Amino acid sequence: MYLDGNLLSQEQSLAYANRAFMNGDAVKVYFFFKNKKVILAEDVYFFLMSSMRKMRMNIPLSFTLEFFTDIFSQAIQNLPFDNGYIKVLAFRKIEDTFSAKTPVHFVYEMVREDSLFQINKNIELDIIKEISVNTHILSNIHTHCPENIYAEIYAQENDLDDVILLNPSKRIARSIYGNLLFLEGNTIKVPKQTEGAYISPLMESFITYVHKNRLAEIEQVEMIAFESQKADEILMISDEKGIFSVNKIRNKEFPNSRFSEMIEKWNLTLV
């Protein structure tokens, strides 16, 4: 294997000899820990299993909930910080013959994030129209997505923190990094997964709490782009980045007082 024209040793080649790097053949999920304790583990685990099945991966018998919680719990105890997330990437090994039985490996990284379960900061969005995201079963999981890469560069070039991605029907799907929640009156509107929204254990935990405690009505919706301007408040929840209040879309600004109060109450239950 060569890198920039230079021959790599066999050991150096190992870093690139996987289908995640060569083919984008991987799925990604995020486990969470707070005060050195893994939380929402079961929800994230089942999302990982579902993502791997959708990608037709050969799930090892060792990939149990107990297996992941044990290795993560041990690793967390050795960290110099208490709060954050665990980025897990499952990928197929490169073999001469590719099949659904190709062995699967996983790597994980522990990332510090002290404000993961509270609103980080205000962000500015706009709608990107020249690309769209799909609405099939692979659109809801974290796998290789060139649309995200394009949109991230677009956001940087236009001094935006994120963008609203539409589906082929010109309806709101999600943002680059996560899902959008629109508060109108006493109703939180969330784009349906069939619209291209991500499956998000973090968001599901929040809206389940809101629903059970009757803080607001939850409505799964199909929304045209213009309807974002009707919202009283907008929240973006990302399993990787955390929680952000959308304070501006084009010329309209949004407050965040009600969402802030809901997030604060929900955060206290995550123990």
Task: Give the ranges of each region predicted by the language model.
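Helix-start/capping segments and mature chain N-termini
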Residues: 1-74, 99-271
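Short, acidic/charged, Gly/Pro-enriched secondary-structure junctions
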Residues: 66-97
